[in-house]
Amino acid sequence: MPVVLVVNSGSSSFKYQLIEMDTESVLASGLVERIGEPTGSTRHKAGGDSWERELPIADHTAGFQAMLDAFAEHGPSLEEEPPVAVGHRVVHGGDVFVEPTVVTDDVKADIDDLSALAPLHNPGALQGIAAAQTAFPDVPHVAVFDTAFHQTLPAEAYTYAIDRELAAAHRIRRYGFHGTSHKFVSEAAARLLGKPLEETRIIVLHLGNGASAAAVQGGRSIDTSMGLTPLEGLVMGTRSGDIDPAILFHLARHTDLGLDDLETLLNRRSGLLGLTGLGDMRDVQRAAADGDEAAQTALGVYRHRIRHYVGAYAAQLGGVDAVVFTAGVGENNPLVRRRSLAGLEFMGIGIDDDRNELISSEARFVSPEGSPVAVLVIPTDEELEIARQSLAATAG
């Protein structure tokens, strides 16, 4: 009964899941947060029960010790069934890492070197890896990169039309993100369609507070909406998605906004929040239903951008077998699904209202029976995908 511990570490917190790989079931999960603050906290779930504790957590090493204490006190026992691998989510692997990689000192050095591309994410992942290696010194650790799935993009998809020497010197290209989710969902879609993965043409819409689209041909990503950073592409909760870059020059010249201010504007004060003052899709929909014109416009912009990418990716794929919705908004918001695909019937893409309104946590069809293009809702499971990749990377 091999078990894998999956860790998603940030600068001041980390989440974990212990997954039994024969049945792919979650044995335990938890959260350690407020690391480095006067009062930290842990939350541990196992066997249908949950326990919380407040305590000082000086650093990630202390956080992992608190996690080990929770396992020892509440189970399951890691001494009786130690993990065969520890899988770590790492946001940015650049063009260095194209697959899950067993962690070595050289790998950690490369991840650190890539922190310039992900300053908010990679350093926290490294802290988590170091602490986890202290906690589990005899277990292989595997780094699974959000960007790796998109390393199959062709040059015409990942290249920006700027000075090529400048781009090369600063590693400027499209990397894409949410790759672990896009991989998990596209493979699940092939199984649901009953087709070999190599024969599928799938558009995945990962719609959460962060959002991205991907065109997946034969199980390989050939295009994706996020770029050098997770800022490009679809409209998101607080991020702008695609804009004319000259907007930044205009604002720099005509306001007192500096470089950091502009970065904050696009990442944290734009998207649905910037358009409406509301960052949650459900709140925006309620406001729109109550007649708020700004909210109605925001929903229109959100849907317009999704349709833009669906059409573009259908062209890149040369046809579509399935459009798949996943992540928090994509899985749980029937109105977003219906309105985002409205008007695409000429492409064979449509929604069955009864299927679409069904509340379910299962993977399912929401398109009409016999539709030329399947529309699917598939709950993503990035932790399980990390566990699968970690186990595969350490096998043999």
From Swiss-Prot:
It is found in: Cytoplasm. One of its GO terms (molecular function) is ATP binding. Its cofactor is Mg(2+); Mn(2+). Pathway: Metabolic intermediate biosynthesis; acetyl-CoA biosynthesis; acetyl-CoA from acetate: step 1/2. InterPro entries: Ac/propionate_kinase (IPR004372), Aliphatic_acid_kin_short-chain (IPR000890), Aliphatic_acid_kinase_CS (IPR023865), ATPase_NBD (IPR043129). Signal peptide: none annotated. The record marks 178, 239 as: Transition state stabilizer. The keyword Magnesium applies. Mg(2+) binds at residues 8, 382. The keyword Disulfide bond does not apply. Pfam families: Acetate_kinase. Its EC number is 2.7.2.1. One of its GO terms (cellular component) is cytoplasm. GO terms for biological process: acetate metabolic process; acetyl-CoA biosynthetic process. CDD domains: ASKHA_NBD_AcK_PK. Keywords: ATP-binding, Cytoplasm, Kinase, Magnesium, Metal-binding, Nucleotide-binding, Transferase. Its main location: cytoplasm. PANTHER family: ACETATE KINASE, ACETATE KINASE-RELATED. Catalyzes the formation of acetyl phosphate from acetate and ATP. Can also catalyze the reverse reaction. This is Acetate kinase.
